[in-house]
């Protein structure tokens, strides 16, 4: 019996835990963990809106849709916009740590400010160029393919400019991949707060008033709904390259050669 208990103890004691003593490693794993959690909430809701929510709403009777929409979208938008903000803020801190490590390895720690400044400027300009392409238009201006091609060109150009500006012999694949993936995520955050939330806030209010007080929907409601749908669909498609580059940061070092 004693031998059996001893053997069992040896088996149970096999796992060995050794937590890193480096506080930077602990901070990074906590940042990545939070980034994953809130990113899943954000992108999960984005996919729900585009793959399930919007198509289902179109098939519902007006009376049912009017009662369901304010209740569902109020809760969904709270989670959607705040999880987006937390995801990006946590991601920016992690990105800054990657930049700082590369700058330290290059022998010029001040490079972190230049790299981050370039990154922020390029993606802000990219969003300013993308923004008008999301407005509902007429004819060719409201063609999905035209809109998709224009936005794709802007995003690709922005990504290439960031790679050129941030390239260097000590620049890591994680630095370059997150510069692109995080940049696209930043565009999505600006759309979440700058378009989708602004539109949905008004549509929720108008729909609730229409159901509870019989107030007719304003004439601009249809245009705003279309604008919000386009912005949400743009975020949906941007999420695919965003997720690829974020995953490639740690698991697919194909951008390191650009910095060589």
Residues covered by each model-derived region:
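Polytopic transmembrane helical bundles with strong interfacial aromatic enrichment
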Residues: 2-260
């Amino acid at each position: 019996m004693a031998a059996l208990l001893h053997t069992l103890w040896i088996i149970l004691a096999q796992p060995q835990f050794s937590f890193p003593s480096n506080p930077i490693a602990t901070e990074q794993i906590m940042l990545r963990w939070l980034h994953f959690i809130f990113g899943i909430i954000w992108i999960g809701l984005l996919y729900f809106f585009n793959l399930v929510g919007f198509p289902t709403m179109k098939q519902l009777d007006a009376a049912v849709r009017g009662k369901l929409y304010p209740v569902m979208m109020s809760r969904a938008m709270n989670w959607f916009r705040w999880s987006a903000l937390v995801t990006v803020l946590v991601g920016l801190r992690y990105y800054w740590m990657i930049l700082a490590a590369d700058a330290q390895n290059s022998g010029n720690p001040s490079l972190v400010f230049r790299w981050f400044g370039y990154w922020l400027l390029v993606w802000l300009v990219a969003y300013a160029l993308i923004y008008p392409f999301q407005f509902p238009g007429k004819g060719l201006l409201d063609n999905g393919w035209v809109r998709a091609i224009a936005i794709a060109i802007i995003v690709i150009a922005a990504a290439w400019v960031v790679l050129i500006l941030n390239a260097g012999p000590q620049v890591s694949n994680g630095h370059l991949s997150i510069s692109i993936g995080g940049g696209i995520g930043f565009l999505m955050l600006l759309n979440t707060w700058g378009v989708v939330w602004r539109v949905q806030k008004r549509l929720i209010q108008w729909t609730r008033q229409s159901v509870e007080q019989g107030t007719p929907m304003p004439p601009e409601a249809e245009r705003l709904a279309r604008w919000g749908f386009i912005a949400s669909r743009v975020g949906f498609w941007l999420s695919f390259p965003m997720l690829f580059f974020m995953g490639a940061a740690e698991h697919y070092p194909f951008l390191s050669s650009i910095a060589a």
